[in-house]
Amino acid sequence: MSKIVKVIGREIIDSRGNPTVEAEVHLEGGFVGMAAAPSGASTGSREALELRDGDKSRFLGKGVTKAVGAVNGPIAQAILGKDAKDQAGIDKIMIDLDGTENKSNFGANAILAVSLANAKAAAAAKGMPLYEHIAELNGTPGKYSMPVPMMNIINGGEHADNNVDIQEFMIQPVGAKTVKEAIRMGSEVFHHLAKVLKGKGMNTAVGDEGGYAPNLGSNAEALAVIAEAVKAAGYELGKDITLAMDCAASEFYKDGKYVLAGEGNKAFTSEEFTHFLEELTKQYPIVSIEDGLDESDWDGFAYQTKVLGDKIQLVGDDLFVTNTKILKEGIEKGIANSILIKFNQIGSLTETLAAIKMAKDAGYTAVISHRSGETEDATIADLAVGTAAGQIKTGSMSRSDRVAKYNQLIRIEEALGEKAPYNGRKEIKGQA
């Protein structure tokens, strides 16, 4: 019943109007799984390769017909007749056939779309929701939790055309009792933030991830307007709602220094920038900082972990790129204490589950994440629940590509009830 009988790849459009790969995996008995690969803007240099055509006459060179061709050709031929329930086996066939370290032959976008579509098809054949199938693949059947959202309500950096250096300013509704309540709290703060910004004569256009992208005078001002919005929404900052930031520091790392336009083009050393962040954590209840230094600045990260690692969650995104080899090295060297998990940085479900397991076994937290280029595919919601990861980062309270994931979490919570607790603050490293 779970034998693969047909594989289809197609070029679809993502939330930025760029092409991406969608795949369908059809099984005996009429079961079908469909999934699409996301795409990042600020990318780590060691991510698996997203294969683009480079033909400037189509989609400004961003077409994915080569990756789609790989799905419809060699990948389909290799997995036809195989058992979709053997996820690790299917992923291994594709990875081995690609034959490169970074999946540059077929493209991580091709392999990932098929990998996720295969998991969905297998779940359908087993007559179970995707999160339940993922929990079984993860070796943790029946163990679920609802993730605490990191809601990106002010966008800067590569995600917005403004003078804010830090890429994301997020809220985490840690005081909620359920994910549904957390989403309501996030929505209320989001709407109050619009009022605060309008009251200051600021722009309320949104960035790639649905957060506002106002022209603020400094990075600290972004935190100040969020604090104002939290209060206006009737919540207590630090108790009901905590703050998180994604610096994406590689984007403003120039010649060994961190150059911040929002701080008057001041250049910081690794140590100075760490203390700049430390000062912000003293002024505001920031409990999580992602990519607080450049991905190659491991000495700086060791220092940052020493200074801040006992107090707050330090998340590695560009730093670790969902790669177990790099994460293992980071764990051994005491770098950061959390990993951001992005399917397409590594390119298959099996490797993604391995990264989550390695992180958890080492006492690191794992934050499941979207990319800035997304589709209506909500697989990351099921991944977060099925691995009991504890945290999810999937944008703001606008744009249907972001909201699709929140709505899926609401549905899953309704189905699981008390079997999937929302643990709030306890999920965040250093906050239990």
UniProtKB/Swiss-Prot annotation:
Biological processes annotated in GO: glycolytic process
Pathway the protein contributes to: Carbohydrate degradation; glycolysis; pyruvate from D-glyceraldehyde 3-phosphate: step 4/5
InterPro entries per record: Enolase, Enolase-like_C_sf, Enolase-like_N, Enolase_C, Enolase_CS, Enolase_N
Active-site residues from the entry: 209, 342
Binding-site residues for (2R)-2-phosphoglycerate, renumbered to this chain: 167, 342, 371-372, 393
Record's cofactor remark: Binds a second Mg(2+) ion via substrate during catalysis.
UniProt organism field: Salmonella typhimurium (strain LT2 / SGSC1412 / ATCC 700720)
Pfam families, sorted: Enolase_C, Enolase_N
Binding annotation for Mg(2+): 246, 290, 317
EC number of this enzyme: 4.2.1.11
UniProt entry keywords in alphabetical sequence: Cytoplasm, Glycolysis, Lyase, Magnesium, Metal-binding, Secreted
Cited function: Catalyzes the reversible conversion of 2-phosphoglycerate (2-PG) into phosphoenolpyruvate (PEP). It is essential for the degradation of carbohydrates via glycolysis. 'Moonlights' as a plasminogen receptor. Binds host (human) plasminogen; only protein purified from the cell surface binds plasminogen, soluble enolase does not.
Swiss-Prot/TrEMBL catalytic activity: (2R)-2-phosphoglycerate = phosphoenolpyruvate + H2O
Oligomer and partners: Component of the RNA degradosome, a multiprotein complex involved in RNA processing and mRNA degradation.
Keyword Membrane attached: no
Protein name, UniProt field: Enolase
CC cofactor: Mg(2+)
GO cellular component terms listed in the entry, alphabetical order: cell surface; extracellular region; phosphopyruvate hydratase complex
Keyword Metal-binding: yes
Localization per Swiss-Prot or TrEMBL: Cytoplasm; Secreted; Cell surface
Family: Belongs to the enolase family.
